[in-house]
Amino acid sequence: MKPEHTTMRVAMYYKNDDVRIEEKPVPDIGPGEILVQTVACGLCGGETMEWYLASRAPKVLGHEPTGIVVSAGPGVDKFVPGDRVHVHHHAPCMSCHFCHRGRFTLCESFSKSYLDPGGFAEYFRAPADLVRFDTLKLPPNVSFEAGTIIEPMACTLKGIRQTPLHPGDTVAVIGLGFMGMCYLELLTLEPAGKIFALDFSEWRLEKALSLGATHGLNPANEDVQEKLRDLNHGRGADAVFVTAPTLKAWESGLALVERGGQLHLGAPPPPGEIWPVDSNALYFSEVQINSTYSAHHVDTQAVLDLLEAGRVNADALITHRFGLDGVEKAIQLLLGAGDSLKSLIYPSGVPDRPEA
């Protein structure tokens, strides 16, 4: 297989309200690399953070892609043209201090690896380190659409692994966007007892209940701290997972967690924001606070295994589909935080009937 053309269409990001369809050369590949024709790629919430993207723009976004291998460079023996794959956009060096400790996402090489140019393009090049460490063949029963959730759900799986639960623990998830729903799906596989879901959107609260949350709380019309304790024998949550990237959400999480509990921070506020915390109260509460950035090859393989086994439902999380010219609309939809979760981009156009 070879690409039909030497140029391709890409969605070039300049700002949240300025995404342009442009033409770029189809990337050449070298030893150990593969060229992939993008079938579908999810839009990540991080790809709407202008403070994060400003220094990188203009840029082709998209790091949750699935596609078909078009060609493989010399030395590639695990993949052949026609293979259906998901490619993770980061890979560790496997030889540094952090890699030796299993903290792969802290590896200096990790965030320097990338897809060329990105998933919002008709084709992309996967460099050799990505091919070697974190390119996954999709099993026959895992669709291209389902494969797009591997990377983001792997991030939430990593967060749960860093926040181990005891049987019967009461947990709370703050923020019910796509990532919050991923936490919910995975928490239903854990030994948790009550699962509280918190959001300002009634639509998202209803969705959370359908995915396994036992209680939905809306901070807009009730005192969620008092309500959670009323429903939990006077106690706070044993573990709180915060997915909203705001200090207010972090403060809410700390207020909801029980003494001796765990607070997991799953999304970053803008740089420079300082979190004022009562340090004395925090000390005596013995609350453990952790955070997680990205995911690695152990997590992505685990999510693929869950998808193949039918243990998680990708279809329930995908709400919108767009062609390449719909990236800007998808960004605005995500920023609106309305009746949407995951939007997929189809660079070659949305099929009449997405692959089952």
Feature map (PLM): residue ranges:
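C-terminal hydrophobic helical "lid"/dimerization subdomain
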Residues: 2-10, 251-255, 297-356
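Short Gly/Pro-enriched turn/cap motifs at secondary-structure boundaries
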Residues: 14, 25-26, 56-62, 112-118, ...
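Glycine-rich beta-strand-centered segment in the early N-terminal region that forms part
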Residues: 26-41, 52-97, 139
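NAD(P)H dinucleotide-binding glycine-rich loop of Rossmann-like/cofactor-binding domains
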Residues: 93-174
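Mid-domain Rossmann-like dinucleotide-binding core that forms the NAD(H)/NADP(H) cofactor-binding site
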Residues: 142-222, 226, 241
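Glycine-rich cofactor phosphate-binding loops and adjacent beta1-alpha1 units
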Residues: 163, 189, 206, 211-288, ...
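Short strand-turn motif at the edge of the Rossmann-like AdoMet-binding core
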Residues: 266-270, 292-294, 322
